[in-house]
Structure formats: structure tokens, C-alpha cells
């Protein structure tokens, strides 16, 4: 399957006979985003206003739709030249195992192929093999670090 830096791509999985729409258009609602994030138990879903604003101001938000239902989302922040950071890769549990996350990663890899680095930020170590399967490698001397302020945020 080829990926192009297009605004929309329709992917048909002939084996499963399923059709999903992949798009960079930010035409999702706060409620749709909140529902998706809560479906995977991500705390960000408890802050729909902030989450929506963050997504709207992100460099790339690739969403996956089953008709009118938001079933997958990937968010990327980039500096326009050298570094693109994948911050979210999530798929509704009812749609997991259908290859959606992998297709989103391949789309992002194609879009950012001219950047020096594409960083992935899996929040769970058990997701590292997924990224490795798609060509990512662990940084030898690096580690992800963060300050978590969500308990202080209202």
C-alpha cells in the first residue's frame, strides 16, 4: 500500500472487507475526541476542552473514521524541518487488531520522510515492539522524561 501526503485517503482492507477513512482534516468534535480517549482510559479524555484545543493546534492530527464514528487518532508535533514527535496513537478497543494503528504510523512515516528524526513516545513499555515493527529503534542512551501536572489542572 502506498501512502501520499494527501489530505484524505480511503483504505479498503479486502481481506476483512472493512472500509475506513483516514484524514488530516480536523473536523472532529470535542465529544468525539473525548469518547475515543476515554475508550482507551486515557486521562486526557477527562479534559475535553483542553484536549480539543491541543489537537486543533497540533501540526498533524490523523483521524480514522468508520462512517461517522471516530475510531483512531494520531497526533504529531513538528518543527517544520528536522523533528516530528508522535504523541498519540490510539484506536478504539472495538477496532483494535485491525491494523489501523500500523496504517496510521506508516502514513506519518511517509509524510515526515524528509525530516531528520521521527520520534515515537509510547507511554507504555509494552507498546515498544509495535513501534519497532514499524522501523523505530530504542535510543541507546536516551529516555523519555516528563513532569505530570494533570492533578493540578482544573
Please describe what each predicted stretch is.
Residues 9-46, 142, 154:
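Short amphipathic alpha-helix that is part of the acyltransferase structural core
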Residues 38-61:
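Active-site rim helix/loop that mediates acceptor-substrate recognition in acyltransferases
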Residues 63, 69-78, 85-90:
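Conserved beta-strand in the GNAT
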Residues 78-86, 96, 141:
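A conserved beta-turn-beta hairpin within the catalytic core of GNAT-like acetyltransferases
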Residues 91, 97-110:
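Conserved acetyl-CoA-binding loop-helix of GNAT-fold acetyltransferases
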Residues 110-123:
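Conserved GNAT acetyl-CoA-binding A-motif
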Residues 119-121, 132, 137-153:
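Conserved catalytic-core motifs of GNAT/GCN5-like acyltransferases
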Amino acid at each position: 500500500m502506498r501512502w501520499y501526503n494527501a489530505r484524505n485517503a480511503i483504505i479498503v482492507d479486502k481481506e476483512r472487507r472493512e472500509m475506513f477513512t483516514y484524514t488530516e482534516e480536523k473536523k472532529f468534535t470535542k465529544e468525539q475526541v473525548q469518547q475515543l480517549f476515554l475508550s482507551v482510559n486515557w486521562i486526557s479524555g477527562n479534559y475535553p476542552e483542553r484536549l480539543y484545543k491541543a489537537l486543533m493546534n497540533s501540526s498533524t492530527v490523523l483521524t480514522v473514521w468508520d462512517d461517522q464514528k471516530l475510531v483512531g487518532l494520531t497526533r504529531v508535533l513538528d518543527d517544520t524541518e528536522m523533528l516530528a514527535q508522535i504523541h498519540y496513537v490510539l484506536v478504539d478497543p472495538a477496532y483494535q487488531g485491525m491494523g489501523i494503528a500500523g496504517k496510521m504510523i506508516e502514513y506519518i512515516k511517509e509524510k515526515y520522510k524528509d525530516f531528520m528524526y521521527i520520534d515515537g513516545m509510547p507511554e507504555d513499555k509494552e507498546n515498544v515492539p509495535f513501534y519497532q515493527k514499524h522501523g523505530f529503534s530504542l535510543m541507546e542512551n536516551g529516555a523519555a522524561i516528563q513532569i505530570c501536572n494533570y492533578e493540578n489542572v482544573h
